[in-house]
Amino acid sequence: MIATVILADSIKEAIEKIKSSSSDLYELRADSLKDYSKLELLEPYSEKLVVTIRSKDEGGFKELSDEKRLELYSKFLEIKPRYVDVEFRSKIKDEVMEIAKRVGSRVILSYHNFRETPPFGVLYNLLEDMESEGADIVKIVTHASSPKDNIRIIRLYEFADNLIAFCMGSKGKISRIFSSMYSPITYVALDKKAAPGQLTLEELRVILKILGEGR
């Protein structure tokens, strides 16, 4: 499935962007919002929503305390989004996963490294640790400093099915393309890119058409 990343100042703007795009899913980067009122307006789109409130340490747009993030996750989970994304290293991980499972939302447990792509052994151990938490999908994203980093991250697909793994940055685009064919969810930009090297929806569709994997 393709998830278009939605960056917006308000819920109203987020809905306008959702309506302007045709996508399987929409990742609402709630950490980009300035106004959290009227969350209930998102309920008609809940089956297509991936709610992410990214921490500043892992690429979030602003500093939010753990208490505030947990409060926001709880409010967003009241509309029962299809997926909720929370960081593996987050102190509120267990609470968010518990609430999500109680309301029937699926959990994406994520790890982001903006500095490097660790050695394969480190990545493999990380994958095992993350899988043991019981999330529906594991997401591992690293920074590519060289083309070889793509190979390390792609190798993870040998050992997991419900995995999203790719490298960020201009040197990581090949892993994003590979991920689009083997991951349960592929992230694309609508207008403003949320991460280095991210493809737009149209760019991805052109690439998949060439590869015979059109969606």
Curated annotation (Swiss-Prot):
Molecular function via GO: 3-dehydroquinate dehydratase activity
Pathway in which this enzyme or protein is active: Metabolic intermediate biosynthesis; chorismate biosynthesis; chorismate from D-erythrose 4-phosphate and phosphoenolpyruvate: step 3/7
Keywords attached to this entry: Amino-acid biosynthesis, Aromatic amino acid biosynthesis, Lyase, Schiff base
Pfam family, one: DHquinase_I
EC number(s) per entry: 4.2.1.10
Catalytic activity, reaction form: 3-dehydroquinate = 3-dehydroshikimate + H2O
Coiled coil (residue ranges): none
Class of enzymatic activity (EC top level): lyase
Catalytic residues of the enzyme: H112 (proton donor/acceptor), K139 (schiff-base intermediate with substrate)
Stretch forming the signal peptide: none
Organism domain of life: Archaea
GO biological process: 3,4-dihydroxybenzoate biosynthetic process; amino acid biosynthetic process; aromatic amino acid family biosynthetic process; chorismate biosynthetic process
Entry binding sites for 3-dehydroquinate: E27, L28, R29, R54, R176, Q198
InterPro entries the UniProt entry points to: Aldolase_TIM (IPR013785), DHquinase_I (IPR001381), Type-I_3-dehydroquinase (IPR050146)
Record function comment: Involved in the third step of the chorismate pathway, which leads to the biosynthesis of aromatic amino acids. Catalyzes the cis-dehydration of 3-dehydroquinate (DHQ) and introduces the first double bond of the aromatic ring to yield 3-dehydroshikimate.
Annotated PANTHER family: 3-DEHYDROQUINATE DEHYDRATASE
Family statement: Belongs to the type-I 3-dehydroquinase family.
Subunit structure: Homodimer.
Designated name of the protein: 3-dehydroquinate dehydratase
Gene: aroD
